[in-house]
Regions:
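FNR-like FAD-binding dehydrogenase module
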Residues: 1-243
Length: 243
């Protein structure tokens, strides 16, 4: 999918500052402000997001990022289960734990970014000759995956597979990193983000980015969101103001 311009990944980035909260143990924080800052007639949807870090001990510096864990859209999960004729209560195994397929698709697995490994595994599970042929042509596969989410592939090539086969074909969801748009010296126990919502129409269907759609469309002010600070040691302002 088309990535948000302010979702970032830094080489050499490390976990945040002195706090019990990190990528493996994120803070369940309050989303305090979700404000659209683009005009009514703008083709872009950009949000000013404020999240409370009160009592967490989390701190950040210029150049750091906020990692955001998100839930996939329940409507997207429902449609995927309908297309694959899988009951939402079907138990599946994921990383040694048991979930219902609905839980796994909502909380654990990547649905809004497509990738070659999914096509390969889905083609094998559904015995789809056309997809198997596509997998062999890397350039054609890259072109096919452009702007397609997982559900687009399944919609294009419907087939029967088990709930466990679907889970095994999907990769683990990764938190999205957003550049922090605030100075902690000014906002203290808050963190501010400027989030460009990934939203586009393709193949006859509306599409939303996973994390940006979650923050903009599915979280209300006062709702909880799991976050952590990702420190960027490659970007630091000089300690001396005269530098």
């Amino acid at each position: 999918t088309s990535p948000s311009a302010n979702v970032i990944a830094w080489p050499g980035a490390t976990d945040g500052h002195h706090s019990v909260y990190n990528k493996q143990n994120p803070l369940l924080a309050d989303l305090s402000v979700n404000q659209k800052i683009t005009g009514r007639n703008s083709s872009k949807d950009v949000r000013h997001i404020e999240i409370s870090l009160a009592g967490s001990g989390l701190s950040y510096q210029p150049g750091d990022a906020l990692g955001v864990y998100f839930l996939n859209d329940s409507a997207l999960v429902r449609d995927l289960l309908l297309l694959t004729a899988i009951s939402r209560d079907t138990p599946v195994q994921l990383a040694g734990e048991t979930f219902t397929i609905e839980q796994a698709l909502t909380e654990q697995l990547e649905l809004t970014q497509s990738y070659p490994a999914f096509v390969e595994k889905y083609a094998a599970a559904t015995h789809n000759a056309a997809l198997t042929e596509l997998v062999a042509d890397k350039a054609a596969l890259r072109a096919y995956l452009s702007e397609r989410q997982i559900i687009d592939i399944v919609r294009d090539h419907p087939g029967l597979l088990s709930a466990q086969q679907l889970v095994d074909a999907l990769r683990k969801q990764q938190p999205r990193l957003y550049s922090i748009a605030s100075s902690q010296a000014e906002v203290e126990d808050e963190v501010h983000l400027t989030v460009a919502v990934v939203r586009y129409d393709a193949y006859g269907q509306p599409h939303l980015g996973g994390a940006s759609g979650f923050l903009a469309e599915r979280l209300n002010e006062g709702d909880k969101v799991k976050v952590f600070v990702e420190q960027n040691n490659n970007f630091r302002l000089p300690a001396n103001d005269d530098t």
